[in-house]
Amino acid sequence: IVGVGFAANVNGDGEVIALGRDAQTTLAEVPHHIELDRVLITGDAALGQRRGIALNAAHVTIANSDIRDIKDVGQDSQAIAGWNTPGPITIRNNFLEAAGENILFGGAHINIPNVIPSDIIVEDNYLTKDPLWRGTSWTVKNLCELKNARRVLVRRNIMEYNWSGAQAGF
C-alpha cells in the first residue's frame, strides 16, 4: 500500500488498519509480506483514535509514514501495536504520535502457540506526544514498550515529549 491516507474510525474505536487478527490460531492464518509506504493515518482531533495499526501479520514493513492524533481516554492507545505476530517487522522512518504507547509489542493474549513477536527493527523514527495533551484526560503512557518480544533492534530514533501520566516511564 503506497501513498494512501486514512481517517479515524467512527467514535475512534478499534484500529484504523488491521494487519491480521488477534483471533488467528495458526501461522497459516497470518497474512504476510505487507508493506505500508507513505501512508497517512490521522485520528480524530476531538474524539481520538484507539490504534493506528494493529500489526498481527508477518514480514511487514511500515516506512516513510505518518501516524498522528492517536489517543484515548481511560484506555491505552497506540500508533502501532503487535502481539499475535511471529515477525519479522520493520518500522522505519515514520512520524508516530500517540498518547499511549507509540509502539507496543506484546500486552495482549497470543493465540498462536509458541509465537513471540520476533526479529523487529525500529529505526530512524520520530516518536512523540503532542505537548498540548499534557494536563488533559488523554491516557499518556510510554513512547515505546516491549512486553513480549525478542531480537529487537531499536536505533537512531528520536523520542520526545513524554511525561508521567497513566504510567511513569519513557
Enumerate the predicted regions with their spans:
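Alpha-solenoid helical-repeat scaffolds
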Residues: 43, 47, 51-54, 69-71, ...
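Right-handed parallel beta-helix
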Residues: 2-8, 28-43, 58-71, 86-105, ...
